[in-house]
A protein has these predicted regions:
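N-proximal low-complexity "stem/linker" segments adjacent to membrane-targeting elements
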Residues: 1-23
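Acidic helix N-cap motif at the loop->helix transition within catalytic regions
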Residues: 18, 40-49, 91-92
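Short, acidic, metal-binding catalytic loop of nucleotide-sugar glycosyltransferases
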Residues: 22-31
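A conserved acidic beta->alpha catalytic loop
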Residues: 23, 35-44, 83
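Short acidic donor-binding/metal-coordinating loop in glycosyltransferase active sites
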Residues: 36, 56, 76, 82-86, ...
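A short, glycine-/small-residue-rich helix N-cap motif at loop->alpha-helix starts
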Residues: 56-64
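Conserved donor NDP-sugar-binding/catalytic core segment of glycosyltransferases
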Residues: 61, 77, 87, 91-124
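Active-site nucleotide-sugar/metal-binding loop of Leloir-type enzymes
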Residues: 66-78
Length: 129
């Protein structure tokens, strides 16, 4: 397991949250769901994976993420923010496992390149690649 915590912002994400959490569980057990009072099964599904659930009124993504940073006592060196409808492919997880421990200690943040998928196809144009 990596020394990383994961923040997932949710609101009515029962359709996506299981796939997202399953991809994260391959490298971290420190999963924090910041939910905006979902009325579907988002919370129940997240709890079934032993995720930590916190709820906060949603204003915008930036404020919700900042709220998480201010209200969680992280015990890991790194924090990853991911949307509930996103997931990590195995090759990206391997790359994270191989590269993260070797990043210079002066670096405090990184940006991961992502594949944007639509209807099971990788979007490689329109500023998304």
């Amino acid at each position: 397991m990596l020394d990383i915590s994961v923040i997932i912002l949710t609101y009515k994400e029962e359709k996506h949250i299981e796939r997202c959490i399953k991809s994260i569980k391959k490298y971290s057990d420190n999963i924090y769901i910041i939910d905006s009072y979902s009325t579907d099964n988002t919370i129940a599904i997240s709890k079934s994976f032993n995720s930590t659930i916190l709820q906060n009124k949603f204003i915008n993504q930036s404020k919700q993420f900042a709220w998480a940073l201010d209200n969680i006592n992280f015990k890991t060196e790194w924090i990853l923010r991911i949307d509930a409808d996103e997931y990590l492919e195995d090759n990206l997880i391997i790359e994270i496992k191989n590269k993260l421990p070797n990043i210079n200690k002066d670096i405090v943040g990184i940006n991961l390149k992502r594949k944007h998928m639509f209807m099971d196809k990788w979007i490689k144009f329109g500023g998304r690649y």
